[in-house]
Amino acid sequence: MLGITTLAALPLGNMLFIIIAFLLLMLILKKVAYGPLTKVLDERADKISSDIDGAEVARQEAEKLASQRQAELAETRQNATKVVNDAKASAQKQSDLIVSAANDRAASVSQQAQTDAQKLKEDAISGAKNDVAALSVAIASKLMQKELSLNDQQALIDAYISDLETK
């Protein structure tokens, strides 16, 4: 109750002076303390906001880089797969060429062997014919005790060969 009595005991002039002094003190505090304090708080809020915005931009940039890296990785894998497939195809093609060349060479060697065998057979038959003809002439000469002329010999050989061919 002391405060109420004191307030009522104050004269109006003192009360008016105290109110004006209080308002003046509030105005000075607003200019001196509140203004710089709000300025510091606003600057701090702006810095926090810009840091958040910067972090968001950095996050978006990181996501963008990550997606680029993923795309590059996929492209690299695709290129590597293509290189491997191309190498396999090239190796298969080269293998086919080597096999084809070997088959051609084998066919050529086989054909040459057949040709050589045929020639040897013909030479053997021809040699055998000549030997048989000479033997036949010798036997016939001995049997006949005379020597055949060249024409008679040839006729006898031809007859003997045709007789052999029919058998």
From Swiss-Prot:
Q: Where in the cell is it found?
A: Cell membrane
Family annotation (InterPro entries): ATP_synth_b/b'su_bac/chlpt, ATP_synth_F0_bsu_bac, ATP_synthase_B_chain
Pfam families (UniProt xref): ATP-synt_B (PF00430)
For whether the record's keyword set contains Phosphoprotein, the answer is no
Signal peptide from the UniProt entry: none
GO CC list: plasma membrane; proton-transporting ATP synthase complex
Under Gene Ontology molecular function, one entry of this record is: proton-transporting ATPase activity, rotational mechanism
* Keyword terms, alphabetized: ATP synthesis, Cell membrane, CF(0), Hydrogen ion transport, Ion transport, Membrane, Transmembrane, Transmembrane helix, Transport
Q: How does it sit in the membrane?
A: Single-pass membrane protein
| Transmembrane regions | 9-29
Quaternary structure, from the entry: F-type ATPases have 2 components, F(1) - the catalytic core - and F(0) - the membrane proton channel. F(1) has five subunits: alpha(3), beta(3), gamma(1), delta(1), epsilon(1). F(0) has three main subunits: a(1), b(2) and c(10-14). The alpha and beta chains form an alternating ring which encloses part of the gamma chain. F(1) is attached to F(0) by a central stalk formed by the gamma and epsilon chains, while a peripheral stalk is formed by the delta and b chains.
Q: Which family does it belong to?
A: Belongs to the ATPase B chain family.
Physiological role = F(1)F(0) ATP synthase produces ATP from ADP in the presence of a proton or sodium gradient. F-type ATPases consist of two structural domains, F(1) containing the extramembraneous catalytic core and F(0) containing the membrane proton channel, linked together by a central stalk and a peripheral stalk. During catalysis, ATP synthesis in the catalytic domain of F(1) is coupled via a rotary mechanism of the central stalk subunits to proton translocation. Component of the F(0) channel, it forms part of the peripheral stalk, linking F(1) to F(0).
User: What is the protein's given name?
Assistant: ATP synthase subunit b
Q: Which organism is it from?
A: Leuconostoc mesenteroides subsp. mesenteroides (strain ATCC 8293 / DSM 20343 / BCRC 11652 / CCM 1803 / JCM 6124 / NCDO 523 / NBRC 100496 / NCIMB 8023 / NCTC 12954 / NRRL B-1118 / 37Y)
> What is the name of the gene encoding this protein?
atpF
